[in-house]
Amino acid sequence: AGGWRLGFLAVPKKLNKFLSSLKSLASESYSTVNTPTQFAAVEAYEGDYSDYKLKVRGILNAVGNYVYSNLKSNKILINPPQGAFYLMPEFKNSKYKSSAKLCEAILKDTGVAMLPGSDFGFKPKKMLTRLSYTDFDGKEFFRNVSNYNSISEEMVKRYAPNVVEGVSKLSNWAKNL
């Protein structure tokens, strides 16, 4: 999920008056794209990758739903995944003074790394975190999926064992809040 990114900007005609301002802001965020990313983009835009995208979405959906199903509890508030590669669990009844301190404790106690909600503009005292669920061998998982609509929990356990282990550790840790 980490790595180099490439973006583009599409603006409806009725918002053209904002285009120069948007370009100026955008140039500070994602200009000077590195050469490997440019070559990858050319390849990506030339081919038909619809089956690939459906399969990858199916895998991320299955893994995300596994994380959601196994974390939601009276100690952890969490919404189901909606297309990203991370979830935003909120820890209830927390004894920590900030989401950053909460994440530090979780990392120390479980080995699970999360980002504090305060890194994303939430109030530091809100015990909201961001948890990525991409710690798995995507190539191996992809190779073993034949039907992206029916990825079982067993497949998630087999091909995303680090995610499964992390969710288990996090769930057990939260029971002591």
Tell me what each language-model feature is.
Residues L71-N79, N176-L177:
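Surface-exposed helix-capping loop/turn segments at secondary-structure junctions
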Residues P12, E46, E90-K92, T134-F136:
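Residue-level recognition of strand-loop junctions within catalytic nucleotide-signaling folds
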